Amino acid sequence: MIIWLAELLQPYLSFFRLFEYLSFRAILSVLTALGLSLWMGPIMIKRLQMLQIGQVVRNEGPESHFSKRGTPTMGGIMILAAISITILLWTDLSNPYVWAVLTVLLGYGAIGFVDDYRKVVRKNTDGLIARWKYFWQSLIAFVVAFALYAYGKDTAATQLVVPFFKDIMPQLGLMYIILTYFVIVGTSNAVNLTDGLDGLAIMPTVLVAAGFAVIAWATGNVNFSEYLHIPYLPHASELVVVCTAIVGAGLGFLWFNTYPAQVFMGDVGSLALGGALGTIAVLVRQELILVIMGGVFVMETLSVILQVGSYKLRGQRIFRMAPIHHHYELKGWPEPRVIVRFWIISMVLVLIGLATLKVR
């Protein structure tokens, strides 16, 4: 929005030429989203407390979690508001990639909102019925996948980029739609599973978004994309501003979500942020690097799959409790230790993911 206004005012005030620079808008994006989150945080927490919208805690969970019962949840609303406002302010709204991310972010946020509402307001511990949750997630993912495929059919936008290999970029064809579906839905649910401790999900989300900001910048730059042997996608550069909006909003939320948390993001935040990260990975053609950079999310998801599979096949559990962060809690690790160590793992994995761009 601002970029259009700046174009109109450039002939009169040269200052507005600054808004043409991606780096300038990326910095403003971080600061705007951070400021909005910090401003909305106390208001949101107070409002949620007044409405008695508090966290539901499972009785079979770690005893240390019982004290969290009643902590305001659905704080993801302020994350989505900060990201959305920032994107509308600082991105080029004629860019289709921006709208693809916004569609998934707000669509999955709506699904998470209904799920949270049923849990904490209607006191239905199951929330939104699983099959309906997956139906709406799938519908949104397929709509976005079909739209992106139609827009970039048989171009670099539908190639598969394989880490460590500079000459292996097969054209996916219709498989692009299937891959896009699984990446968006899978990442959304993976972040949702990770969101079980104070700040555990939001910091890896911030780190992965920061990593994708670098990748989006390189992908949208003709010289660097050629140098790194990755597809050149001119629309991808605008995703830098989207990623930095996620970084800023996430850091602002972490201010209130750090241990001991004053507010939780709820499904409205985790499903939306995961879906947005998956969409960004698809748009910059780095789905496989997402598996590396988002390794904490992958680890949490695999722990659940292995736990359920082992119990059904052998009648035995592999972990004391899944997702795996609860396993370490039950082993006696203090919650802050689990959180910070997972953050460190996430930071290392993001750096490894970025390194793969050069190691080819």
Swiss-Prot record:
**Which keywords are on file for this protein?**
Cell cycle, Cell division, Cell inner membrane, Cell membrane, Cell shape, Cell wall biogenesis/degradation, Magnesium, Membrane, Metal-binding, Peptidoglycan synthesis, Transferase, Transmembrane, Transmembrane helix
GO MF annotation, one: phospho-N-acetylmuramoyl-pentapeptide-transferase activity
Q: Where are the transmembrane segments?
A: 26-46, 70-90, 94-114, 132-152, 168-188, 199-219, 236-256, 263-283, 288-308, 338-358
Q: Primary place of residence?
A: membrane
Q: In which pathway does it act?
A: Cell wall biogenesis; peptidoglycan biosynthesis
According to its UniProt record, the EC number is 2.7.8.13
What reaction does this enzyme carry out catalytically? UDP-N-acetyl-alpha-D-muramoyl-L-alanyl-gamma-D-glutamyl-meso-2,6-diaminopimeloyl-D-alanyl-D-alanine + di-trans,octa-cis-undecaprenyl phosphate = di-trans,octa-cis-undecaprenyl diphospho-N-acetyl-alpha-D-muramoyl-L-alanyl-D-glutamyl-meso-2,6-diaminopimeloyl-D-alanyl-D-alanine + UMP
- Names of the cofactor(s): Mg(2+)
Membrane topology per the record? Answer: Multi-pass membrane protein
BP terms from Gene Ontology: cell division; cell wall organization; peptidoglycan biosynthetic process; regulation of cell shape
An example of a Gene Ontology cellular component annotation for this protein is: plasma membrane
Where does it reside? Cell inner membrane
Family affiliation? Belongs to the glycosyltransferase 4 family. MraY subfamily.
The record's function comment reads: Catalyzes the initial step of the lipid cycle reactions in the biosynthesis of the cell wall peptidoglycan: transfers peptidoglycan precursor phospho-MurNAc-pentapeptide from UDP-MurNAc-pentapeptide onto the lipid carrier undecaprenyl phosphate, yielding undecaprenyl-pyrophosphoryl-MurNAc-pentapeptide, known as lipid I.
Q: Which PANTHER family match?
A: PHOSPHO-N-ACETYLMURAMOYL-PENTAPEPTIDE-TRANSFERASE (PTHR22926), PHOSPHO-N-ACETYLMURAMOYL-PENTAPEPTIDE-TRANSFERASE HOMOLOG (PTHR22926:SF5)
> What is the protein name stated in its UniProt record?
Phospho-N-acetylmuramoyl-pentapeptide-transferase
Its source organism is: Vibrio campbellii (strain ATCC BAA-1116)
